[in-house]
Swiss-Prot record:
PROSITE patterns per UniProt: ZN2_CY6_FUNGAL_1
Job of this protein: Probable transcriptional activator involved in uracil catabolism.
Acidic residues bias (residue ranges): 161-170
Annotated GO CC locations: nucleus
Chief localization: nucleus
Name of the protein in its database record: Uracil catabolism protein 2
Amino acid sequence: MASDNSQTQTRTKKPRKKRKTYSCGVCRKFKTRCDFEPLVGKCHRCNVLRLECSLTKEREEEILAAVESTSKSTLAPASLVSGQLPALAAANPVVANDAVVVAPVAATLSSRLNKLESSVGSLNSKLDLALMLLQGSNSAISNLKNLTSSKAGMGDRNATYDDDDDGDDDGHDHSDSDNFVNGIKLQEPPLKLISDIDERLFPTKAQSQQDILAKTQRPFVVARFNFLKYFNQHEQLCLDLSRDFLVKSHFWIIPGGIKEINRTYVEKHLFITSVFTIIAMGFDENNKYEKEQEQLYPLVERFLTNTLTMFEKLTDHDIEAILYCSMFNISRKSKRHRQLKFNSLVLCNFAVNSVLNIVDFHKIKERVLINEEYSALDLYHLRILNSLTACRLQYSIGSGNFTIQDDMLKEFNNLTAKFPQANFGDDIKISEINLGDIVNGIFLNFKAYFKGFSKRFRAETRGHADRNRDCLVIPELEYWLKNWDELLSKDGGGVLLFAYDFYYSMICRSFLTEFFEEEFQNDVVYFKCALKTMKRYCFSLLDGFLKLPPSLIKGAPTITLHQLVYACLTLCDFLHCFDVAERQQVLNLCTKIYWHLNTIGEKLNEATDNVGKIIKSLIDTSKRKAQVSGRLAVPRNTKRGSPSMTPGFQQSVQSSSALQGSKAGSPQSARSVNSQGSGADSLAAASFNMPDVAQFNSFEDFFQDFFDNLKPTTQSMFSTLQQQQQ
């Protein structure tokens, strides 16, 4: 019985409770002190001696808890460097070499290490950029930017954060929209601070009665006083002329502007009122306001020339006035000995810099894209900037001063499309800027562009029997035409197509004049295609101008009339390359332009004067060419693949540059082109006068009378197509 009880006690005896150990196996074996370090994952002794520690597995939960509790604080650079950085540096060799720490610990430490490396790399990049800026090395800065972007991309690919690490961010979430609007206008740039100090040391405030009197003699103050006096004497005239300008030119100027002004507006904005008035004086025929214009011009000239000294104090209306001075003539051609001709490109550049100085477009961009605020004042400032940008591009291209366009400025130009109150005119401005930017880009690298264009043209037309019928196709312009097709279909005035035709003809003419000896001299087919394309778009430009409503033409900017004259001049310079029928078309169309400008009230205008001289040059040039060769000999390819040009054709094409002098209205200037005509013929051409349009009821009567008064030898050049066969 006793034995049974003892067996039962043996079976029911509880197992001995295992004593909790706080030391690792190595420390227990050598009976040494064991201090466990959770962030390291080992005890102090094993860590120093680089031994495997049993506590790494036994206290896994404690290790993870310690890492997680310190993760948030370790993201701060100061705490990371001062506290946990040594621990991490000591832990990494163990993790890498011994592979003892389990996967969750390794992932956490790896994540934190990636964040640390990314932060340090960004800091190094910024320090390097600062050093490069101090050294002034542009190439190094460019390389550094590329290096920074590549490092940023690598950091993004290497960073593999767990879901538990979302709280480890620095709290700055940069979205794409934030990066798009992170530009600012500095509130305290260095030169502004220096200028403020200068104003404090040398105040502009008048201290004495003598200073007050001297201040009233400042040029801009005198100009304001004198124009206000002029306005008081001619108040109704100024108001009426300002209304005429705003009504007639509203299609070309800032969209959505005012149509009428009053005395209150005039007193606040004297400069722009004077510009309205003097431009409108040029719209009327027969020098109706010649006396008033002579009195007003010195006042406007003083306003305009003193804007440089008023740069910091210019208002948005002042800059708008400078815009109109660059778009329209404020001086009269007949008074050029006294009234200056201002450089429109210089005025545009100054106005663009001025508006960027007084308006914070970065704030406008932020309000539009982030806050979705669409104020009327912001739209007004953006419209001024867009009109200035379009005008500057037109004059840059027209004068051959091609410059790289600022990407930031392009972003500002596109902001008007975001406004719900934007209208059709705003879309036209954006389209004009886009077209000008495309053409400007072509001319910036014109030599390389032409070589690539010629190579593609020959590759596409090789083996085609009808190469002579092809017109050149400039893909960049065709892309623009397709991209803005919907807007062009709604453009009743055809203004955009007018600019499109001008740029097409300008590029083709530049091909012929700049690269004739390199390319066209040995490829007659290529030359004829370029010539045909140039003629096609010159004709399209002139036909489009004839279709414009008179109300648009009367208020058109000078650049538009310059484009018109350029088309006539181009046809004149290359007239000897056309056949008889084409010559007659050129003469007929240019004469119709002259008639149209006169009948819509543009008498005594610079465009009518130039077109009239060009028509006279057309006649004189054609007459001499007929006397030299009897008819124009069109060269042929002697053998496929090896085109050759006759000496007469080569000489006639090269002579087109000599005819540039004809645009000055002097037919004798073209006599250097092997002219065999008599002196009497030249004198007759020089003394030729265009008939008075007012004497005729229709263009047909005007042209017939004009044609009947030509010499018989000149008539025979344009009469019939059969003359070409003689």
